[in-house]
């Protein structure tokens, strides 16, 4: 029997960020492997027109929880939603709910964060730093708490090329940053943001680094650990391959490529695509919770959940497999035939963004206007290019993460636990994973039926014919404008045609000679 699964039986668990991608998969795995756990508290932000219980039912009614309902039919009774807002002081939780959390919680998984790369520094500090500080304060008042697991990111120290399993200092103390956010106005914060984040690419990575320091400084006597995942992608194995429900990371790129919106991207083809399946991150996180509670390490251990140093895959290989899979199972209503090229220079990137992205969008918007519809393609394309520009830093660099603690933890698990909570990324078959990823994007994100594949292929053939027709027409126009009006151009043209004719004639004659 799994020791880890048995450990979580009869436990009361608090999960922040449970309505997010990682949080949902974490909750599903806990219920599926430990159906006898006592309760999972989830902090849910109030939403107008929807009760907390309705939001829980919405989560449970997704395909992700189908297997859970078989092993834990009363799962809805074991989820206790608590109205909370991490943007508010003390999370705006009622006194009754606070008292219940303080007296009952055994394990905390802190998954909540803002993952927006362009978030204002005030917002990023509130969700990634201040909220962590407040949760630690609450945790310090929980007499039954056994472990506090903080989910950070492997890119919290992306300004370094080699990252160890340690917490790196920041020039300005987190407490000073938190205090300054309370009285500085937005314009001043925007002005000082570049100086604060330094050589990090955005406020997300900077504030996640601050959050780690807060965990180290303010955890007191708590048993704490930090998990640092890299780019979190679709499920690898559990509860089934390819499940994904957000546009973050590779998912948005796959859709943009498959729909024909994205034809060129600035990236280093041989750079490591450090994507990690979400179920791998979840299995490691659950194992870390068990190890931290049972073995009570003397210091805060950091665990890297990354793939590049153990089972690397580069962006070129990933791109080829994405295109090969899309050719077999194309997306419906594609804007253009799927194709994607890597560029490495700024000039080439700007050129293709204009010629291959914005100009076709403008032409399509003109067509929409002619047919009496609202133009939208250029606006959509500009949003896409802005998103891509924020990802460029991560697809043009490679990092090395040490994984000593992760490998140590794997060796501590029994064979049964290694099977049930598998986070050994060395077993991952990238070609198979990427194919399932693309299929999952089609089924779970785009909600497209596989029965529509023949029609989608027919649509792509139509787009191919339009492409050939357009190129032919463009060639004839250029010929008419340049060659037909210039004697020199005609001479060059006739020379090329004559040369090609003679070459073909020579090739045919030589191929008939008998040796």
Curated annotation (Swiss-Prot):
Predominant localisation class: membrane
Cytoplasmic topological domain: 1-464
Transmembrane segments: 465-484
Gene null: resulting phenotype: In the knockout, the meibum lipids do not melt at body temperature, resulting in plugging of the meibomian gland orifices and the typical evaporative dry eye phenotype.
Family, similarity comment: Belongs to the fatty acyl-CoA reductase family.
Biological function: Catalyzes the reduction of saturated but not unsaturated C16 or C18 fatty acyl-CoA to fatty alcohols. A lower activity can be observed with shorter fatty acyl-CoA substrates. Can produce very long-chain and ultra long-chain FAls, regardless of whether they have a straight or branched chain. It may play a role in the production of ether lipids/plasmalogens and wax monoesters which synthesis requires fatty alcohols as substrates.
The protein, known as: Fatty acyl-CoA reductase 2
Native organism taxonomy: Eukaryota, Metazoa, Chordata, Craniata, Vertebrata
């Amino acid at each position: 029997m799994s020791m880890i699964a048995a450990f979580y039986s009869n436990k009361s668990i608090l999960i922040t960020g449970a309505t997010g991608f990682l949080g949902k998969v974490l909750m599903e795995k806990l219920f599926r492997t430990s159906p006898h756990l006592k309760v999972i508290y989830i902090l849910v932000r109030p939403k107008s027109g929807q009760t907390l219980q309705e939001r829980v039912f919405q989560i449970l009614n997704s395909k992700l929880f189908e297997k859970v309902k078989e092993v834990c039919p009363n799962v809805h009774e074991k989820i206790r939603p608590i109205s909370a807002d991490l943007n508010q002081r003390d999370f705006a939780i009622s006194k009754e709910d606070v008292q219940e959390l303080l007296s009952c919680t055994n394990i905390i998984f802190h998954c909540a964060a803002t993952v927006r790369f362009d978030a204002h520094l005030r917002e990023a500090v509130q969700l990634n730093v201040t909220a962590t500080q407040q949760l630690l304060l609450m945790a310090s008042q929980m007499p039954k708490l056994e472990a506090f697991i903080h989910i950070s990111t492997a890119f919290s120290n992306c300004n370094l090329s080699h990252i160890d399993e340690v917490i790196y200092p920041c020039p300005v103390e987190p407490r000073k940053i938190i205090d300054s956010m309370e009285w500085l106005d937005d314009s001043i914060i925007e002005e000082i943001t570049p100086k604060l984040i330094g050589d990090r690419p955005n406020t997300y990575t900077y504030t996640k680094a601050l959050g780690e320091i807060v965990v180290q400084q303010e955890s007191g006597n708590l048993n704490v650990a930090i998990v640092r995942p890299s780019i979190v992608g679709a499920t690898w194995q559990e509860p089934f391959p390819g499940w994904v429900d957000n546009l973050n990371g590779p998912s948005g790129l796959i859709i943009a490529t498959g729909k024909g919106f994205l034809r060129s991207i600035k990236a280093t083809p041989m750079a490591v695509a450090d994507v990690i399946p979400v179920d791998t991150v979840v299995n490691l996180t659950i194992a870390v919770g068990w190890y931290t509670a049972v073995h009570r390490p003397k210091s805060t251990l950091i665990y890297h959940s990354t793939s590049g140093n153990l089972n690397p895959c580069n962006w070129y290989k990933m791109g080829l497999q994405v295109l090969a899979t899309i050719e077999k199972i194309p997306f419906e209503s594609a804007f253009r035939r799927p194709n994607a090229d890597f560029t490495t220079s700024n000039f080439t990137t700007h050129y293709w963004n204009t010629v291959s992205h914005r100009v076709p969008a403008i032409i399509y918007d003109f067509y929409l206007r002619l047919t009496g519809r609202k133009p939208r393609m250029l606006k959509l394309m500009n949003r896409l290019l802005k998103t891509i520009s924020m990802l460029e830093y991560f697809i043009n660099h490679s990092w090395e993460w040490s994984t000593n603690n992760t490998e140590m933890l794997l060796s501590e698990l029994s064979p049964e636990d290694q099977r049930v909570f598998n986070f050994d990324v060395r077993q991952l078959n990238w070609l198979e994973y990427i194919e399932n990823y693309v299929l999952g994007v089609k089924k779970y994100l785009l909600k497209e039926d596989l029965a529509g594949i023949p029609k989608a292929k027919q649509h792509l053939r139509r787009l191919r014919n339009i492409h050939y027709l357009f190129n032919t027409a463009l060639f004839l126009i250029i010929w008419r404008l340049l060659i037909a009006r210039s004697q020199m151009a005609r001479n060059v043209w006739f020379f090329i045609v004559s040369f090609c004719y003679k070459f073909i004639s020579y090739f045919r004659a030589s191929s008939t000679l008998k040796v």
